[in-house]
Amino acid sequence: MTLSPLLLPLQLLLLLLFSGAVCRAEAGPETESPVRTLQVETLVQPPESCTESAAIGDTLHIHYTGSLVDGRIIDTSLTRDPLVIELGQKQVIPGLEQSLLDMCVGEKRRAVIPSHLAYGKRGYPPSIPADAVVQYDVELIALIRANYWQKLLKSILPLVGIAMVPALLGLIGYHLYRKASRPKVSKKKLKEEKRNKSKKK
């Protein structure tokens, strides 16, 4: 009989722990963690006749609707002309650009984009808060394929621009060197040469 007063607090403690575990199990899983990777879902399948899909360098005409996860629309092109972008030129947020790769004309996709591939820690006040996950529904209206020479030119042009700086500096240095290495003619000699030329005339 002396053990029962000691067991009572232990029984109460076990009862509390067990009831807490039951309550957590009934509440279900904790709230979802924020989206960390790009999630792309096809809403309208590409036509079977699709032979060309979007690739880096191509020009795309797209209609889109961007929204926050709570459903608030942040931007849409449905009330105006389609947006024209060139893939690979960073004209839209990275997550949206990645979701457009391999898309066919007539296809429609939904992209759920984590903040680090969207507007990041700054957001885009006032419509997009910091660290916001955004969702874009995108339809590819038209695709203009970049030819081989256009792609080559666009990849080489920045390199040519970078190479021009040292080339120009080299030319300037060479010009200054040639100018400095010429024998200096005195002013007196120059005057004499001018007089001699004028006498000959």
Swiss-Prot record:
Described function: PPIases accelerate the folding of proteins during protein synthesis.
Subunit structure: Interacts with IFITM5.
TM ranges: 156-176
Signal peptide segment: 1-27
Residue ranges constituting the PPIase FKBP-type domain according to the UniProt record: 57-144
Organism: Mus musculus (Mouse)
Similarity comment: Belongs to the FKBP-type PPIase family.
GO molecular function: peptidyl-prolyl cis-trans isomerase activity
Family matches, as Pfam families: FKBP_C
Biological processes annotated in GO: chaperone-mediated protein folding
UniProt keyword Ligase present: no
Keywords of this entry: Isomerase, Membrane, Rotamase, Signal, Transmembrane, Transmembrane helix
Location relative to the cell: Membrane
InterPro entries: FKBP2/11, PPIase_dom_sf, PPIase_FKBP_dom
Membrane topology: Single-pass membrane protein
GO cellular component: membrane
SUPFAM superfamilies: FKBP-like
Protein known as: Peptidyl-prolyl cis-trans isomerase FKBP11
Catalytic activity: [protein]-peptidylproline (omega=180) = [protein]-peptidylproline (omega=0)
Known EC number: 5.2.1.8
Taxonomic superkingdom: Eukaryota
